[in-house]
Amino acid sequence: MHKKETSLSHSKIANEMMNYINTYIDTPINIDHMALEFKISKFHFHRIFKEQMGENIYECIQSIRLQKASNLLITNQSSTISKIASLCGYSSQSSFLRAFKQRFEITPKQWRQGGYKEYSNKILKHSNTLSLIEKNYISQEPKMVNIEKRICYYIREKGYGFNSLKTWQKLKAWVYSNNIKEYSLLGIYHDNPILTKPKDCHYVAAIMLKEEDLLENTNLPYFNLYSGLCAEFSFEGKYEDILKLIQWVYHYWLPTSGYEATTIPSYIKFEKNDYFDNTGTFVVK
């Protein structure tokens, strides 16, 4: 296998595994079974994942579980701590409590009672663009919309904003080279930006196709966009304003809305994307 083919194969394996982890985070994830699915040895599987994602696969799974839980503890006020632990794949509440305290330095109960704000401040004081926002930062009620499953081709990046312009320009070139006429631009936010250091945040820039058929001879990975009921907000501003919108939704709107979040990540549909179309602004839903 040529070097380019090997690199594409390794990228495909790692990306498919990340999609699997995020989709089935509420279940036990068997690495031996997944290695068999990819028809490679467990050792080779671990090496490929770390080479592509920059972290150990077990550490990655643990990190995703805890990030999901840290959000749900804030948004899902009527859910018990044990239920949230279960939703994020922990079969034992004691192991969840131990892992959570080791990561965030406080208990889930203390976190839920407002401890997350102090944790956020430690992250935000090193950020030039983000800050804790007030409850009245945005004043609007969303539309409740049902999202259908659609095929998305994507580029995954680690770190909010570090490579976004370059990533979207690559996707623009991909759209033109594949002669795609009807599509939508999506940004998928796997981490809450004020609960995770910007350099550690996972972000996916995606092209959602109108057609249901898969493309042939393309080197980009794909996934099926999650279907279900979503709250849709309209917003216009700069790139960093999008992250402030996400903060407001998670920390102010959701906890008092009567709705509860799931482990599915939030995403943005761009009506205008300055990194893609040079319009000078971002208009999102």
Where are the regions a protein language model picked out?
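A short, Lys/Arg-enriched amphipathic alpha-helix from helix-turn-helix/homeodomain DNA-binding modules
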Residues: 3-29, 59-79
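N-terminal intrinsically disordered/low-complexity leader segments
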Residues: 1-8, 32, 39-40, 50-53
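Short, Lys/Arg-enriched, disordered terminal segments
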Residues: 1-11, 127-134
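Detector for methionine-enriched segments
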Residues: 1, 17-18, 34, 53, ...
